[in-house]
Amino acid sequence: IPAIKTFDEVQQKIGSDKIQEAMESIGISMNKENIGLASAIGGWSYGISPLEMAGAYATISNNGLYTESHTINYVEVVQTGETFNIDEEIQNNAKQSAYSKASAFMVRQVMLDYTKNGSGNYAYVSGINNVGAKTGTSNWSSSAKNGMAGKSRDLWMSAYTSDYICSVWMGFGKEGIDKGKTTSQYKAYPGKVVQTLLNHLQSKGSQKSYPDQPDDVEQAAMVKGIYPYVSPSEGMSEDMIIQAWFKKGTAPTQSVDS
């Protein structure tokens, strides 16, 4: 599984403490979590709230800059007319997350591409201008009771545009779980909700643009399906070649024939 393989490589290189710091830098509470390989595919003790997830996704469209998630714009004191601009204060206190502008740009471009050309639940949002999205599913363990073993436990879709972020979670409370309900038959619902929200919010078009490409990022050709990455050889079929984003100096230099 690519996510687990990547997580394992990163964990071995920088350690669990650095991973925890990176997660906390984008607003995800890690106080009660034990970081391990299962974390890469949703194996969390307590999990992430939609509010935390939306705040984390906002960094992708905002150059890696983290702004604390909040639901209050301002507070006005009726008796005095005094106004406290909560949103303005939080925006002014935004902090750079653990990852760079270059990383945010590359993640954003990859997500925009596969969302635009995606199938399944991505089809619900693929027609929205400049949208990037990711779905998520977790299943009950093989030891779960009441016939729940291996069945779908909850569903996600989180998405962003240059203006808005939304994160939708779907699952059942104890009563539904006790009745044996699973999310298996409702897989399309998060995508439909995200589609409805963004279509409404974006009905007048985009107000902002994504940040420009950083100077330390470049695009280069590489061969599909080969890792470590290699550059295409002369005369290779175009079907085997894709354009990918790299930090400058890290694009593949060896060809597939080397």
State the predicted function of each range.
Residues 1-30, 34-62, 110-113:
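Active-site-adjacent helix/loop patches that line small-molecule binding or acyl-intermediate pockets
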Residues 47-258:
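A penicillin-recognizing enzyme superfamily signal
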